[in-house]
A protein has these predicted regions:
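Exposed beta-sheet edge and beta->alpha loop/turn motif
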Residues: 1-2, 106-184
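N-terminal low-complexity, Pro/Thr-rich disordered segments
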Residues: 1-30, 174-184
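Core segments of small alpha/beta cavity-forming domains
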Residues: 15-93
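A mature extracytoplasmic/lumenal domain signature
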Residues: 68-71, 79-81, 96, 104-106, ...
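A short, amphipathic edge element
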Residues: 88-109
Length: 184
């Protein structure tokens, strides 16, 4: 999955075990992200993933909220926001803690729905990513429960003129504004 639409302010300095990253490139909403098309869906998934990584690298959930209006994923990442805001730690070791590899050229329509789609792929957590914790031992980001190499799907729905990442907990009357670690 490729995404290359970022706002850059100053020279990017990667995080280390001694200091957090500086001037992390901020994902910008692609012009076609809300189009009801395969290209629009791809742009949405790419932006969603870039925003997810941005929260992990900065604690700033503002870009994620543009891809997650109901704050489902932003809330699930709140521990990172609090960690950065409280100067308790940061992520280091990689610029992209989470990557996704889509394994088909197009998504599949979810059965029984005209607005939901699944795009199969693999989600991987970087083995190099670590979490620095002030006054404590650093931790690996990837754990035995991380979904590495596991076949997953980006499950999305088009509703109210935009794409939403689904969690898998929506049921048939989805609250179309959610996302999932099991879906993506």
């Amino acid at each position: 999955m490729k995404f290359d639409n970022f706002e850059k302010k100053g020279e990017y300095v990667p995080a280390t075990a001694e200091k957090k990253a500086q001037n992390v490139p901020k994902p910008l909403v692609p012009a076609n992200m809300n189009e009801q098309s395969v290209d629009g869906m791809y742009a949405f998934i790419g932006y969603w993933l870039a925003s997810f990584n941005y929260v992990l690298m900065t604690g700033d959930a503002e870009p994620m909220k543009k891809a997650d209006p109901a704050d489902v994923y932003a809330k699930s990442l709140q521990e990172f926001t609090l960690m950065y805001e409280s100067d308790l730690g940061w992520m280091y070791g990689t610029d992209t803690p989470v990557t996704m590899e889509l394994i088909s050229s197009s998504p599949q329509k979810a059965s029984g729905s005209s607005t939901r789609y699944n795009w199969p792929g693999y989600m991987n957590y970087s083995a190099d990513a670590k979490i620095h914790r002030e006054g404590k031992s650093d931790l690996p980001f990837k754990t035995s429960s991380s979904p590495n190499g596991k076949l997953m799907k980006a499950a999305v729905e088009y509703k109210d003129g935009k794409w939403f990442m689904l969690t898998g907990d929506e049921g048939s009357s989805a609250s179309a504004s959610s996302g999932s670690s099991s879906s993506v």
